[in-house]
Regions:
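Start-transfer (signal-anchor) and selected internal transmembrane alpha helices
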Residues: 1-30
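Membrane-helix boundary/interfacial segments in multi-pass membrane proteins
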Residues: 146-153, 311-366, 371-372, 376
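Periplasmic/ER-lumenal interhelical loops and adjacent helix-loop junctions
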Residues: 232-301
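Hydrophobic, aromatic-rich transmembrane alpha-helices
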Residues: 285-323
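Extracytoplasmic
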Residues: 404-586
Length: 586
């Protein structure tokens, strides 16, 4: 080993080996997503069925910068209910085609997470940055490649950047750091992270003021600057929340009221596994490493009777923070507490204060980083053990097929096609939206902007292709419209109690539901339905202005339901057939 340490190539490799996995992954991801293009397999849930269609509608209607206009879904939704143009992620969709913007968002999120982590770690451990550099970049890289909720990937990845700005303000107080903090919300999102960052900052201000025995004016100013930044970047959201005056579906959302035992179980589950919107894939490598280290560290403190170190060790602080966020997540399902919060702050009615859990992936990888640098401090062999651990964590993220791992599913499904000579049943991006098919449909039926609805497919497919929809998916729209739309689907809701509860107690998905099957909306080539009848009130459909229904099912009771079949259309590759129906005249 002594001979190796004298060789320049080994010294260089020890310092810069991380460049190979980082560059290799970025090239692989870019090659796969741009190589397969729109034939890639992209996550549907809360992604292609929601935000990608919203961005495409803004593009179709040239409404990114518009004010006082309605977007043609859910009977007409204010532009202010959709993502702000002051978001860097939204800007991508303003200048690039939707699929290209989505891929650039994935790659940008990785770089943002990695360099944000590098800035923060470099600030906290400046004296040993050169030594720790490989695990700084690798831990940041792993955090960056975690497959978060895509529309808010920048917001997740940039958390360390916000912490970095706040530390610089606390230590230096330079004007440039206040300016940086003011524009930081362009890569964040108030409802998911912003309000909590402000809350955590208030706690930090109180704690530091007590510890330092004087007010921390710099952070107090930072609190005002950050809040102003969020208001400026998300002025549309604040306008709707505070000045809208219209009752929204948030007022009718029914949340679970769990027992004490169920709350404890939920706390343990999210601590261990997280949630699908913020799945840090930490349970496979990061959690075991951190738990083992936690036991060894504090076992040693107890054995040596160093009680104070237990409470002053940064690693223990991070682990306690993780537990705190998990406890808050569980307490959200404590009905009396949740209703108290809503009573004290009415604008937050229906708002999920359990989103503290969204910070846990950053904390898990922060805790892992503390373990790794302490291994670095112990010598050459433990240094390479640390390198092995962080590489294992990276492989766990890359190879775990969680909900938003588009790279895994694209590679797997294309490999399956290559070796088996047939495509999988799932629809890829192009097949899901089927733009060529819907262009043919619009021309054939002479579509002129008539209000329509989808049956057996996501309304997002119609929205993406320039078809105005009475149905749709949005977590914040008029309660009155929810009730009006309910009249259309009442016959189906009366037949399936689970569907009735799903709509009445939530209602974000205003869909045409089956009167028999729990779900007939799948992103698959095969239509999985047992009942080809449709159960709707066609008079209510007409009263809301409805004309067309685009269905993946060939309806067996169209005439009885008050519908007339116009025609059927099949994609050139046979992946999808759409049956077009028109509401019969009275």
């Amino acid at each position: 080993m002594k001979d190796l340490t004298r060789r320049k190539w080994f010294v260089w490799l020890t310092a810069y080996w991380f460049l190979f996995p980082v560059a290799g992954f970025l090239l692989l991801a870019a090659g796969v997503f741009f190589g397969y293009g729109e034939r890639s397999y992209i996550a549907v849930h809360d992604n292609m069925d929601l935000f990608l269609a919203q961005f495409q509608m803004l593009k179709n209607t040239n409404s990114f910068l518009a004010h006082g206009v309605e977007i043609p879904f859910l009977g007409g939704i204010s532009r202010d209910n959709l993502p702000s143009e002051m978001s860097l992620y939204t800007v991508l969709y303003m200048f690039f085609p939707t699929y290209t913007a989505y891929v650039l968002g994935i790659l940008g999120k990785i770089l943002l997470g990695m360099f944000s982590f590098r800035l923060l770690a470099g600030e906290l451990f400046a004296d040993k940055y050169v030594i720790y550099r490989p695990v700084i970049y690798m831990t940041g890289f792993v955090y960056g490649i975690v497959w978060f909720f895509p529309a808010f990937g920048f917001a997740f990845a940039s958390i360390p950047l916000c912490v970095y700005f706040l530390i610089k303000i606390y230590r230096d107080g330079g004007k440039r750091w206040y300016l940086a903090l003011f524009v930081y919300p362009m890569v964040s999102y108030f409802s998911y992270h912003g309000l909590f960052l402000l809350g955590y900052l208030v706690i930090a201000i109180v704690w530091l003021s007590v510890r330092d025995r004087k007010p921390v004016w710099r952070l107090m100013a930072a609190l005002v600057v950050l809040a102003a930044g969020y208001v400026g970047c998300e002025y549309r959201l604040f306008g709707q929340m505070l000045l809208g005056g219209e009752e929204t579906i948030r007022s009718s959302i029914v949340n679970a009221d769990l027992s004490f035992a169920q709350i404890l179980q939920e706390i343990g589950t999210v601590w261990k596994d997280g949630i699908f919107h913020a799945d840090g894939v930490h349970a496979k490598v990061v959690l075991p490493v951190c738990v083992i280290y936690f036991l060894l560290l504090n076992g040693r403190y107890l054995y040596q009777r160093q009680w104070k170190k237990i409470f002053h060790d940064p690693f223990n602080f991070v682990m306690a923070f993780l537990l705190f966020n998990s406890v808050v997540y569980g307490l959200y399902d404590c009905g009396p507490l949740r209703r108290l919060v809503e009573a004290l702050v009415p604008p937050l009615e229906g708002w999920q204060f359990n989103r503290t859990i969204f910070f846990n992936p950053f904390l898990w990888y922060g805790a892992l980083f503390l373990v790794l640098i302490r291994l670095y401090d112990r010598g050459i062999w433990t240094m390479w053990l640390a390198n092995g651990i962080v590489c294992a964590a990276a492989l766990a993220v890359i190879l775990t097929p969680n909900r938003y791992n588009d790279l895994y599913f694209t590679c797997y499904n294309r490999a399956y096609e290559h070796f088996h000579g047939t495509e999988v049943d799932e629809l890829d991006y192009e097949q899901f939206y089927a733009p060529a098919l819907f262009e043919e449909i619009r021309e054939a039926i002479g579509y002129q902007g008539e209000w329509s609805a989808a049956y057996g497919l996501h309304p997002a497919v119609l929205e993406y292709n320039g078809i105005a929809t009475l149905d749709g998916y949005l977590g914040f729209y008029s309660q009155q419209y929810k009730e009006d739309f309910r009249r259309i689907i009442a016959p189906a809701l009366e037949r399936v109690e689970q569907t009735r509860i799903y709509y009445d107690d939530w209602g974000a998905r205003a869909y045409l539901y089956s009167g028999t099957d729990l779900s007939i909306v799948q992103a698959t080539k095969t239509v999985y339905a047992t009942d080809y009848d449709i159960y709707i009130d066609v008079d209510a459909f007409r009263e809301l202005g409805g004309t067309y229904i685009f269905s993946r099912l060939e309806l067996t009771n169209a005439a009885e339901a008050g519908l007339v079949q116009v025609d059927s259309f099949t994609a050139r590759d046979g992946s999808c057939t759409v049956y077009v129906y028109r509401a019969a005249a009275k």
